[in-house]
Amino acid sequence: MRSKFKDEHPFEKRKAEAERIRQKYADRIPVICEKVEKSDIATIDKKKYLVPADLTVGQFVYVIRKRIKLSPEKAIFIFVDEVLPPTAALMSSIYEEHKDEDGFLYITYSGENTFGDC
């Protein structure tokens, strides 16, 4: 999936920003979170997050749910490289496995399970 953030910001600028963030906040992970294009779920008010390394994927999903004011009965799925990450996984391990060459971790979210097959 194409990232709007990548389209709007040149690679060198993104890389420099991620490096600056990692130097200043070594215990935090720079995350870009965007809605899957054709999803009917609410659009998030901000794309850029500085996430504690020890946060779990489930805790991050909770943050996203709050930001888009999603009611408890509605489903939300987050994807990293078009795969559903394990809820108990630490954001630091997801970052190490899936960070982009620019230094950001790109996460997409949707109201439906568009990529996974579970």
From Swiss-Prot:
GO biological process: autophagosome assembly; autophagosome maturation; cellular response to nitrogen starvation; mitophagy; protein transport
Record-stated family: Belongs to the ATG8 family.
Organism: Aspergillus fumigatus (strain ATCC MYA-4609 / CBS 101355 / FGSC A1100 / Af293) (Neosartorya fumigata)
Cell location: Cytoplasmic vesicle, Autophagosome membrane; Vacuole membrane
Post-translation changes: The C-terminal 2 residues are removed by ATG4 to expose Gly-116 at the C-terminus. The C-terminal Gly is then amidated with phosphatidylethanolamine by an activating system similar to that for ubiquitin.
Listed GO MF terms: phosphatidylethanolamine binding
Residue stretch(es) of the prosequence: 117-118
Topology of this chain in the membrane: Lipid-anchor
InterPro entries: Atg8-like, Ubiquitin-like_domsf
One cellular component (GO) term of this entry: fungal-type vacuole membrane
Keyword Membrane among record annotations: yes
PANTHER family: MICROTUBULE-ASSOCIATED PROTEINS 1A/1B LIGHT CHAIN 3-RELATED (PTHR10969)
Cross-referenced Pfam families: ATG8
Protein name per UniProt: Autophagy-related protein 8
Major localization class: membrane
